[in-house]
Amino acid sequence: MRLLYIARKNLLAKPLQTALSTILLAFGVGMVSLMMLSEKQIKDQFERNIKDIDLVLGAKGSPLQLILANVYHIDAPTGNIDYQAAKDVVNNPRTHIESGIPLAYGDNYMSYRIVGTEYSYPEHYGAILKEGELWTNTYDVVVGAEVAEKTGLEIGSTFYSSHGLTDTTDVHRDKTFTVVGIFDRTSSVIDNLLLTGIESVWGVHEGHENADKEITAMLLKKRTPMAVLTLPNYLKDTNMQVALPSIEINRLNQQFGLGADALRAIALLIMTLSFASIFISVFENMHARRYELALMRTMGGSPGKLYKLLLLEGGLLSAAGVLIGLLISRLGLFVLASAVENKFKYDLSDMGLLTVEIKLALAATFVGLLAAALPAFKALRMDISKTLSNE
């Protein structure tokens, strides 16, 4: 305890140098930790939403946009497709498709998408009703847990939809939706949607040419792997295409991976500089206090005790930097989560400590101790008489 007190006092005696070493390490650890937290949550949500969706059938355009719009609901759709033509794709034995889930949308309520679909869609994500029942009549709506929480909708609430996916000004006041059910939280895309029958979406847009025959996309489950090979050829003379979620998301990860790797490299560089700063801090402290250390030796302090003292100073610097870094990462995640929720309606607010973060903290503390151990080792070989005579 006495050594800990002395080590703390020694660090506080040089606040600028101590603060610099701590801040450098904190920012390095904070950046790496923030990337670990955000990547883990984004990956988990992407994998959860893509579960058992082998292919997505939709209008021709960008395959990635087709996936983002209809699986994750974070982009605009590529267009509409004929509902009967989509059902023919599912029912044709040549396509090797086992089943399909239709999605039709184009309206929103308070920027949350209203999606016309079948019961198989919430069943696919294991959605369970918290209150009420599933839709049975046109304009019945079942809302996701996040939608209910953010908008205040409850059983029996009525509202008008707005045209578009984010605009809330072009309101369809001739058709009234009624909330008949609320889903329990699923930690999937269902939480951020309002689900209704396809007929409700068609009814809102009645009068639009072919509105009652079109959907936005069909989520497909293949019967055999041959579907991946046969479908593109089957659709070549139509206005439809299929996209593979796994391939498109891997491509997206590769594109963002370059930026993530660059940020990770910068964070590691900052951490390296912090370890160098710890080395310099302990070395300069030892050099500036060589007379004090020599006196401690003459008063009975063993070389091992001096070594432990200097090592403890490096350990305190490292531990402080790691702890502050973890706090910085949580603050950064809070800001990032707010931005992501406002923009994409996705929740990244899990602040729990990851196993990989514990490993990062231990590794950073160990390297910090190692950086302090090198100059501290020099204290073991101090020439006491020479040091005192020079002073």
Residue ranges and their predicted role:
Residues 1, 240, 293, 331-346:
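Peri-membrane helix termini and adjoining interfacial loops of integral membrane proteins
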